């Protein structure tokens, strides 16, 4: 289910979100 998918991918998702946030701040 969704919870299993999230648990499997959350570390990667968090990294991507952090990188996106940094890129957004740097571009601003």
Swiss-Prot record:
**Mind telling me what this protein is named?**
M-poneritoxin-Dq4a
GO terms for biological process, alphabetical: defense response to bacterium
Q: Which residues carry this modification: Alanine amide?
A: 28
**Location within or outside the cell:** Secreted
Q: Does the keyword Secreted apply?
A: yes
Among the GO molecular function terms of this UniProt record, one is:
toxin activity
Q: Which GO terms describe its cellular component?
A: extracellular region
- Function in brief: The synthetic peptide has weak antimicrobial activity against Gram-negative bacterium E.coli ATCC 10536. It does not show antimicrobial activity against the Gram-positive bacteria B.amyloliquefacies S499, L.monocytogenes 2231 and S.aureus ATCC 29213, against the Gram-negative bacteria P.putida BTP1 and P.aeruginosa PaO1, or against the fungi S.cerevisiae, R.mucilaginosa, C.cucumerinum, F.oxysporum and B.cinerea.
Secreted: is it a keyword of this entry?
Answer: yes
Q: In which tissues is it expressed?
A: Expressed by the venom gland.
* Keywords linked to the UniProt accession: Amidation, Antibiotic, Antimicrobial, Secreted, Toxin
Domain of life assignment: Eukaryota
């Amino acid at each position: 289910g969704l919870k299993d998918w999230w648990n499997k991918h959350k570390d990667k998702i968090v990294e991507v979100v952090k990188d996106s946030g940094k890129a957004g701040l740097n571009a601003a």
